[in-house]
Amino acid sequence: APRLPQCQGDDQEKCLCNKDECPPGQCRFPRGDADPYCE
């Protein structure tokens, strides 16, 4: 699967992230080994 780009600023597209890089409630943590992403 293609890797998602890293979060940058207020980018609203799906991207790799941590809870400090996304608006509250917008960071998704998929099951398994998938990386979290903004949504």
Curated annotation (Swiss-Prot):
Subcellular location: Secreted
Annotated signal peptide: none
A GO molecular function held by the record: enzyme inhibitor activity
GO cellular component terms listed in the entry, alphabetical order: extracellular region
Superkingdom in the source lineage: Eukaryota
Record keywords: Cell adhesion, Secreted
GO biological process, one term: cell adhesion
InterPro entries noted in UniProt: Hirudin/antistatin
Family, similarity comment: Belongs to the ornatin family.
Function per UniProt: Inhibits fibrinogen interaction with platelet receptors expressed on glycoprotein IIb-IIIa complex. May prevent blood from clotting during either feeding and/or storage of ingested blood.
Protein name listed in UniProt: Decorsin
Organism: Macrobdella decora
Source taxonomy: Eukaryota, Metazoa, Spiralia, Lophotrochozoa, Annelida
